[in-house]
């Protein structure tokens, strides 16, 4: 009996060693223009094409287990509510960078899913938790944070959209940030760009921002314009187009102009931020080779 038990254990170990194991990070994309749900997944395939593994929504505590197999329509992974009832299903296709396909719950609408092969070094960032204190530095540090949405999470970097309630009760506002999850600090994408290449793209972005800003002003009454001038707006000077934050989402880079008229912070609610978005493919020429941004967005 003991000899049989040892044989079974040895056989199981040999089978396990033949399994192919991959780790992925990526996202569910419920709305192609909205926030993502960041995911981390471990997927194991044995020699017969059967899969086991687990995933986590990186901002929630639960680990979800699944099993699956290769089928005609791709890799099908199922999360079971019990022995016979499917709670969730992934239908995935392999690509050069990882996996993509559809996630579908038992009830409700499904979501597109994109998963990239990742490295064990990033496992320490599997659970995403951003310290709100690093988002309270500088402008708006007294305002409360009502929500944080994720635009992209990959390779130890999170691009986020932060909803803020103004301390003075005026219109809520939104800020964008890129966070180094390993060092738990904010980073500026402009530090990782080729200056002359970025300057060329920024000319187009500035031109768009100026045009939109002028159109905004046409909607204001004289008394509102007077208030804005009292708050530091000076149309005789160049617009403050250098006051811009860059942030990535799934497929694009966005220029976010926070305060093109250079008004005092207490009056910024009077003007709406302006955005200019270009595809990442067009922005690649601006990225410094070998930088973290190159590894994040280009894969080199």
Give residue spans per PLM region.
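Sec-dependent N-terminal signal peptides
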Residues: 2-12
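Compositionally biased intrinsically disordered regions enriched in Thr/Gly
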Residues: 22-300
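Sec/Tat signal peptide C-region and signal peptidase I cleavage site
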Residues: 14-19
């Amino acid at each position: 009996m003991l000899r049989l038990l040892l044989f079974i254990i040895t056989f199981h170990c040999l089978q396990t060693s033949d399994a192919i194991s991959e780790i992925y990070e990526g996202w569910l994309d419920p709305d192609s223009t909205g926030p993502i749900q960041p995911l981390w997944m471990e997927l194991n395939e044995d020699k017969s094409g059967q899969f086991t593994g687990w995933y986590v929504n990186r901002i929630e505590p639960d680990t979800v287990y699944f099993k699956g197999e290769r089928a005609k329509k791709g890799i099908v992974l199922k999360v079971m509510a019990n022995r016979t009832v499917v709670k969730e299903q992934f239908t995935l296709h392999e690509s050069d960078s990882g996996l993509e396909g559809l996630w579908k719950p038992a009830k409700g609408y499904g979501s597109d899913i994109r998963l990239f092969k990742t490295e064990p070094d990033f496992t320490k960032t599997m659970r995403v938790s951003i310290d709100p204190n690093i988002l309270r530095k500088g402008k708006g540090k007294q305002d409360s944070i009502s929500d944080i949405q994720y635009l992209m999470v990959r390779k130890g970097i999170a691009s986020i959209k932060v909803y803020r309630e103004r301390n003075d009760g005026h219109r809520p506002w939104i800020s964008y940030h890129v966070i180094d999850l390993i060092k738990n600090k904010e980073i500026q994408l402009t530090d990782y760009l080729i200056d002359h290449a970025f300057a060329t793209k920024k000319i187009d972005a500035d031109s768009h921002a100026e045009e939109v800003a002028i159109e905004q002003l046409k909607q204001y009454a004289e008394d509102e314009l007077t208030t804005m001038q009292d708050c530091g707006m000076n149309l005789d000077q160049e617009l403050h187009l250098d006051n811009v934050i860059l942030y990535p989402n799934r497929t694009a880079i966005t220029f976010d102009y926070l305060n093109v008229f250079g008004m005092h912070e207490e009056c910024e609610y009077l003007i709406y931020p302006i955005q200019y978005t270009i595809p990442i493919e067009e922005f690649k020429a601006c990225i410094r080779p070998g930088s973290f941004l190159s590894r994040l967005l280009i894969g080199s």
